[in-house]
Amino acid sequence: MYYKLEGRKIDEENTKYRYVFIDEITLLSDFIDTAAVLSDVFSMMGMKIVVSGTDSLGFAMANRDELYDRSVTIHTSFIPFREYARLLNICSVDSYIEYGGTLKMENMSFDDPDAAFDEVAFRDDESTRKYIDTAISRNIQHTLKNDHYGEYFNQLRELYEKGELTNVINRIVQHMNHRFVLRVVEDEFKSHDFGSAKELLLHDLPAERATVLYDVNEKQILERLKAIIEVKEKSETTVPITQEHIDKVKKYLLMLDLIVNCPERYESGKQAEHIVFSQSGMRYAIAKALVYSLMQDAYFASIPEADKAYITGKILDDVKGRMLEDIVLLEVRKTAPSTMEAFKFKFDAGGEFDMVIYDKAGQNCRIYEIKHSTEANEKQTLHLRDAEKCQIVEKRFGPISGKFVLYRGKDTFAEGVQYLNVENFLCGLK
């Protein structure tokens, strides 16, 4: 890399260069192992070197060795909602999720240009496959190929070479609780989104659409889904997966700020790991792939178009609802001052507050329910109005200074609970 830069006549005698910007520097095959020339040679000439690239792990590996303690890293993997809304002038959490947490939708749409704006009109699976593959797997694979002297992620090299790395990553991404444990990778594959949708639709009984997902060919649907997201059963893999493999994947994602641990708190006083994916597209792409697979089912194709739209919309809305909870919690934690903590709180007898914001300085707290709905209804405030649950929280975190429902509707107030528009709430975080 030194000689390539020398070829641009950047040397001690030519000091007119003060700022050097190099885009996609990680495309250089020797970047990881020769990055020190940027700090040891060129920065010593008084230059400021600004580099960028899509291989985030490559930067992390270079910072570990060649650039250790000599660089400042700014992650762009995570784009907060307020920045997305400001730059694109689109104040919609649904669009934010559908864009995949990025500033463009091209990797989340399908071949038909109209499909980008039609959640249920999928044409083929290539764009979803492309997004899932490029979001994480190709990133780590590129670094494994170019880290010639590295040992840190060598446990993943064999998985990469056998084409089985994406299987491990996507099994964890689609798991309801994103658990980094061996069982999640080794157990027979199940779609948590499909199972959740089956249960939700039963609330529509006696309507015929309530049981549609029990009548489709679930096995074939899951086989199609597995093919799209490159998931394999244990018997189909060649490399025995160990907990060490999974721990390395987790470490990698943490290094890149693609996952964040937002610990849950319990009435008993315990805390538990709660992994949140900071790039929403990693999760939403799999939900889209499930809907595409469902649309190919012969029985599903025979039901009324209105029912198709309702059911596929139900699947995606359910996923968006869970993702919205994570988005709000993550963004509040990232912007909260050191005197405040934000966390999900669970009760021993069942139920939870989606978010508690604890003001350690003022010794009080605010409690929140987070809903994807655009309509306010009494059910949304059930836990917030539960006197026993409120007493439990007040005993731990001081008086409750406010009760809130964050949703996609208009600001309003009812029965002691403030309804706030979630998009305005997120845009107001600083």
Q: Predicted segment positions?
A:
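Short glycine-rich substrate-engagement loop in P-loop NTPases that contacts/grips substrate
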Residues: 1-12
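Conserved P-loop NTPase "ATPase switch" module shared by AAA+ and STAND
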Residues: 10-32
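Conserved Walker B catalytic segment
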Residues: 25-50
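Short regulatory helix/loop adjacent to the ATP-binding pocket of P-loop NTPases
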Residues: 37, 57-72
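Amphipathic alpha-helical segments of the small helical/lid subdomains adjacent to P-loop NTPase cores
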Residues: 73-156
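Accessory nucleic acid-recognition modules appended to NTPase machines
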Residues: 139-353, 359
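Conserved catalytic cores of phosphodiester-cleaving nucleases, focusing on short active-site segments
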Residues: 332, 353-377, 384, 403
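Domain-level recognition of nuclease-like catalytic cores that cleave nucleotide substrates
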Residues: 404-430
